[in-house]
Amino acid sequence: MGAVDEVVFLLEEAFSGEGIRETNEAQSFLTNLRSVDTSFWRALPAGGQRTIESITLHVGGAKVMYDDYAFGAGTLQWTDITVRPWPRGFAPMDEAIAWLKTVHGALLDHVRDLDDAALSEPRKANWGAERPTRWLLSMLMQHDTYHAGEVNHVRSLLDRDDFWRWG
């Protein structure tokens, strides 16, 4: 297995890895999103500003932006409908998740087209700087995992079960 295959595996794990089935522990974005009741999709926890809907749209939009700048024309803006297909409060949960899977798949297609040496090549980031390809992809992995935790926390606050089960 080459380096690109490893990167694809890690991107997939951060996005949709199942984690530990026996204890229902998962750190991936999509797996945490699947645990969300539809009544929580647009709900705000006390004192919160981010809904699970808005987090999901942000994660998908970041994938579109990184993909466009690293592998495409590098012209999209955060306000473009391709990046943000619904305004806040109007994204149907099932459609937003389907869109998220689609944009993740498009990114993976570009990564799979790379050879191992290309992981060291500089590519443009969506803020204009150039970074090694592997660095940009690492940011996307971390981004998925970070926001998976955020989804889990918002869901647990809304469900009133925000406590540690093991320690």
Identify the role of each PLM range.
Residues P85-K124, P132-H143:
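Acidic/histidine-rich alpha-helical segments that form the ligand environment
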Residues M1-L33, T38-R84, K124-G167:
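Short, contiguous alpha-helical
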